[in-house]
Amino acid sequence: MALRLDGKQLAAELEQRLQAEIAAGLVQAGRPPGLAVVRIGDDPASGVYVANKQKACGRIGMASYLSHLPAKVPAAEVLATIQSLNLDERVDGILLQLPLPKGLDEGPLLAAIDPEKDADGLHTLNLGRLLKGEPGPRSCTPGGVMALLARHQIPLAGKRAVVIGRSILVGQPMALMLQAANATVSVAHSHTDDLASLTQQADVLVVAAGRARMIGSEHVKPGAVVVDVGIHRLPADPELGPQVKARLCGDVRAQEVEPLASALTPVPGGVGPMTVTMLLVNTVARWQQHCGLPFGLRDLLV
């Protein structure tokens, strides 16, 4: 039976740690850390994600600020909102909730965020810092994966790692973080020939393909650590009866892979909770540095 890499449990532990860091620095700083979220439009899923982030802020004693703009807002108004938050001394982290409505280009808007307040770690400067091994905000999902691997003392140095997916959001920074941990890293993508022959060599397999149930037992080396970044909602299956409603799944066919793997992240409850937690980590870290407080989160920003 594969070890369950429980992101929900680790996220709860890290929230307690962040709460303690905030409490320890509150008097000297004179204010709590603040996270500002810019939400555009009324996409229901985005609304749920934003609400979850605000609740997480509340649990650790972080202030949260929401700028909710209409779907047809001009790009200039979004830029003005971001610039205002860049100058706001209460704000340590800024998050532009994605995806954006049609007609808005996320590139210039993400670039407008102060790199020091880049809570998502997606600014070009911060991706460059990651590449060079310099300190700075880290991409949240890959950072969460690294924290999970570290929590379970999974060795990476000298291991063969394969990342499926090359997005700037997950795949590319994930590969850089694994490389920094001295793993030998390959990145697979939609043009990779004979994917299984590559993934069967992986001691650590990180799947961020964005395709439901894509990876099965034929892709996994016995004893491999498998990290499933994907999350998808499957429609209800009539053959399972009316009591079985829509289900969540990942990019991995977990029932097939679990008997082979030495460790596996569940979906839900694996990588997802850690993504939100790393957003908080980036924001608290900036607050500590900006307010001249002891920096107690260095181990989480690899």
Curated annotation (Swiss-Prot):
GO terms under cellular component: cytosol
GO molecular function: methenyltetrahydrofolate cyclohydrolase activity; methylenetetrahydrofolate dehydrogenase (NADP+) activity
PROSITE patterns given in the database record: THF_DHG_CYH_2
Family: Belongs to the tetrahydrofolate dehydrogenase/cyclohydrolase family.
One Pfam family linked to the record: THF_DHG_CYH_C
Pathway the protein takes part in: One-carbon metabolism; tetrahydrofolate interconversion
PANTHER family: C-1-TETRAHYDROFOLATE SYNTHASE, CYTOPLASMIC, C-1-TETRAHYDROFOLATE SYNTHASE, CYTOPLASMIC-RELATED
Protein name: Bifunctional protein FolD
CDD domains: NAD_bind_m-THF_DH_Cyclohyd
Subunit record text: Homodimer.
Domain of life: Bacteria
Keywords for this protein: Amino-acid biosynthesis, Histidine biosynthesis, Hydrolase, Methionine biosynthesis, Multifunctional enzyme, NADP, One-carbon metabolism, Oxidoreductase, Purine biosynthesis
Coiled coil regions, renumbered to chain: none
Residues annotated as binding NADP(+): 165-167, 190, 231
Catalytic reaction list: (6R)-5,10-methylene-5,6,7,8-tetrahydrofolate + NADP(+) = (6R)-5,10-methenyltetrahydrofolate + NADPH; (6R)-5,10-methenyltetrahydrofolate + H2O = (6R)-10-formyltetrahydrofolate + H(+)
InterPro entries recorded: Aminoacid_DH-like_N_sf (IPR046346), NAD(P)-bd_dom_sf (IPR036291), THF_DH/CycHdrlase (IPR000672), THF_DH/CycHdrlase_cat_dom (IPR020630), THF_DH/CycHdrlase_CS (IPR020867), THF_DH/CycHdrlase_NAD-bd_dom (IPR020631)
EC annotation from Swiss-Prot or TrEMBL: 1.5.1.5, 3.5.4.9
Keyword Amino-acid biosynthesis: yes
General function of this protein: Catalyzes the oxidation of 5,10-methylenetetrahydrofolate to 5,10-methenyltetrahydrofolate and then the hydrolysis of 5,10-methenyltetrahydrofolate to 10-formyltetrahydrofolate.
Swiss-Prot/TrEMBL GO biological process terms: L-histidine biosynthetic process; methionine biosynthetic process; purine nucleotide biosynthetic process; tetrahydrofolate interconversion
NCBIfam families: PRK14186.1
Keyword Ligase: no
